[in-house]
Amino acid sequence: MSSSSSVSTAPTIGASALNVPMLVSQLMATEQYPITALQNVTTSYQAKLTAFGQVQSAVSTFQSALQSLTSASSLQANTATASDPTVLSATALTSAAPGSYSLTVGNLAQSQSLVASGQTSLTNAIGTGATTTLSFDFGTITGTATGGIYGTGTTFTSAGGGIKTVTINSSNNSLQGIRDAINAANIGVSASIINDGSSTPYRLVLTSANTGAANSMKISVSGDATISSLLSYDPTSTTGQNLNQTIAALNANLAVNGLAVSKASNTISDIIPGVTVNLSKPSATPVTLTVAPDTATVTKNVNSFVTAYNALSTTLAKMTAYNPSTQTAAILQGNLAILNIKSDLNGILNTQAQGAGSLNSLAQIGINSQPDGTLAVNSGLLATALQNNFKDVAGLFAATGSASDSLVAYNTYTSSTQPGTYPVNITQLATLGSLTGSAAPGLTITAGVNDTINMAVNGTSATLTIPPATYSSAQALASEIQSLLNGSSAISAAGISVSAGINASGNLSISTNNYGSAYSVGLNGGNGASGLFGSAPVAAAGTDVQGTINGANATGVGQMLTSSSGNSQGLSILVSGGITGARGTVSYSNGYAYTMNNYLTSLLSSSGALTSSTNELNTNISDVAKQIASIQQGLIAKQAMYTAEYTALNNMMTTMTSTSAFLTQQLSKL
């Protein structure tokens, strides 16, 4: 009987080592899923942040376009056009009335020029160097000049602007030094030196800085006799004219619609209310000056407003769109902040303006909303509105005001002022501070006898010394006192001035040039006080305007009256005259552009909806980044754990493989 036997082969354990890096990498890839999800969230936030940036840019662009419509002056601007711009040009304020004017320019205004006798040197000393005072007075010369010298009977009437002085001494008593001292003093005289080519070639030329007949010079010199003989100039004295007049001071002479007009300057702002005319040359041919509303600029600004609004509206629509066919939503679709902005803008545009005159909606000037949320301009309706209601169009856009009384003017408003029309009642008009004499002034002033007066303006004191003379009239004496008082260093340094004249009773009267209780004129003595003002002069401080606006108390400062409570709070008006009692109404409108601009400013502010939304997104992005960092930190530990575990397993399997090989070898020997 035969028998057979077989030997079993042991299974191979861990025939090869594990690929630990690959295993760990695959495991870690799975662990990355939460990070990938958070990175997708970050991408979404960043996309929204970019979208909000585009919205902010569109809002800023729209606000920039609004600026030209928030200013009433730009919306109510006028143009002034001359038929011959080589003869004259002009500018018109918003207050100018449209119209056409015929102007003929006879001669231009010019400054007086005086020329001194020639000197042989620019730098040689003139005179002894003793301290010398040049005193300049400006006024009107009445008389005839022959060869630059005025004859007998010539008069000089001071303009009352004050005596201006220049000091010459041993440091500057050359011709060049005198020139530089006069220019440095800034007294309204320009000094220059001309070389005429003669044996005494250097001649000092003095030119009044201002044009006009009333800016002729009278120069007195005290001190060095040589300088006095060179520069003293009294046009009323045939022996006192040491300078020669080469150009006489002249007013500009023109005719406006046939009416003769004489003005001191070639820039004239008081012949046509609200219009400044600049004369360039004489012309016997009439020039037509046309003042008209600047409708072209307003039309351009309105179209810019609509274009910028449409760009913003399109941006908002794009960011919040939903495509039903593809079932995809824009990045900010459903965002509450953007939805609120769209709603707020529509609300502003669809609210009627208050206090805007005859117009209260954009539709009345041809601006209408379209189905897609944009605006469209009907150019025909806009042109008609500008033609028929130019001033009221401004009230539709800007913060504007107007008064029904011609002597009451809208001034300004505050953020507290509500749109509306408010009644005005005046209980007291503003007055000037004044000092009025009780008797006619004596016209003869004698040095050391009656030539000084001590005065105070708004509490600032000045002692005046009146030049001794027998004055031609009480008005001439008043002009001299006005000139001295305004020329006082203390008074001019305080930035105040006065006007002096003769009242209906023939008495001297001095008044401040500003209205209100802060202004006064006082007389504090002097040897000439009683002779000029009498024994009982009357000093009266100015008063402030008083009254109500919309029935509420208002605060008056000078001629300015400001409402202090109610809907009109902060509304300020200028009452320039008239009577006490009811003075009509004042209207205020804040307009669409003004309201829109305030809204956009708040929207873009640090606490506004757009800033808050972007801040929230940035915070969310930061929070997600922290979450990712935390997870990544955990994954580092987990990766180390996986590596350790599988490395240990791999080592164990390697050991088992070695044992298996040994056993296999031993079994094969049986």
Where are the regions a protein language model picked out?
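Bacterial flagellar/type III secretion structural subunits and associated motility module proteins
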Residues: 1-43, 56, 64-202, 207-311, ...
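N-terminal, post-signal-peptide region of Sec/Tat-exported proteins
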Residues: 43-51
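Long, contiguous alpha-helical "rod/stalk" segments
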Residues: 51-58
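Surface-exposed loop-to-helix/strand elements on domain peripheries
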Residues: 318-339
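Structured, hydrophobic secondary-structure cores that serve as assembly/anchoring elements
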Residues: 320, 324, 636-668
